Structure formats: C-alpha cells, structure tokens
Amino acid sequence: VDAGFADCGEESEPLLTAPGSRPQGTEDIWLFLHLLFETIWKFRFFYRDINDLLTRNRLVETHFQRILEHKENTAVTVCEGLAASGTLTATAGEIRALATNMSVVATFWLSFEHARRPRGEPDIGHGVYQVMSLAAPYLQGEARRLLEKLSGEYVNKN
C-alpha cells in the first residue's frame, strides 16, 4: 500500500505543479483536469477506499492530506490567474470556495461514478465538465463561450 501510494503521489505532484507555470486558458484547464482525472483513474483503488485507508495507514493519511492541499492550492492559483487576466470575476473568498469545491468534485467524482454505475466505464469527460461547470458562473466573455463549446463537443460525444 505504501509503495503504491508513493507512486500515486509521485505522479500527481508534477501534474499539480504544472498549471502555475504559465497563464492558463479554458482549454488548458480542461486538458489539465482531464490529465488529473486520468491519474486518479490510474490510482482508483486508493480513491475508492480512501476513508478506510486513511484510518488504517498513517503514511497514506499524511500524504493524501498533502495531495488534497496541493490540489486545492493549484485550483486557487489557476482561478487567481484567470481573475488576473479578466477571464474570471470572483472575490478572494469566492475563489477559495470555488477551489475547494473543484478539489472535492475532482477527488471524488470517480467514486460517485462507480456508485452510479459499478459495472460501467467512468466518464472522465463528464467529470471534467462537472468541475469546469463550477467555474462557469464566474467566467467572462470568450472563456465562457469556449467552456460551453468544449462541454457541448466533449460531453455529448461521450
């Protein structure tokens, strides 16, 4: 369990660091979220039983807390970047709440999908859409239109 979870952290950390390296647009964030969901899917055995693992394994507990904190901080950074560019209009408090909600949905979407359809394949695109739709009310102009376009093209295909 420890070695597998270490692999999960090693694969997640660089991904969570990447978005802050340059200004992000709607398509960049969509791609970032898709890659994040693919990583979560790869390590789904941890995510599906995370509550049980947290109570039984102190190493998993501390590492998962760091991963969650990093996810949330990355979401804050991305939203602040969008706000600085005028793409997103939100207060600091709204950005923090949005980042928390985005992190919650991204972290637990596949468990939700599994509970809805235990024998079906997860719909990663729909999960990405759910996370992005949280930001939709705050997006302005072209970013909002692009989100609607991506959502229509991607979610309706899957």
Label every model-predicted segment.
Residues 111, 115-158:
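C-terminal peripheral helix-coil segments that are non-catalytic and often amphipathic
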Residues 15-20, 47-54, 82-86, 109, ...:
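Secondary-structure edge/capping motif, primarily at the C-terminal ends of alpha-helices
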Residues 48-50, 62-63, 91, 147:
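Short, hydrophobic secondary-structure boundary micro-motifs
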Residues 22-25, 29, 60, 91-95, ...:
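Residue-level recognition of alpha-helical structural elements
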Residues 43, 56-57:
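Short loop-to-helix capping motifs
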Residues 27-51, 66-77:
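Helical hydrophobic small-molecule/effector-binding pocket
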Residues 59-85, 96-111, 126-137:
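Amphipathic alpha-helical packing segments from all-alpha helical-bundle domains
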Residues 1-17, 30-34:
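An amphipathic alpha-helix adjacent to DNA-recognition modules
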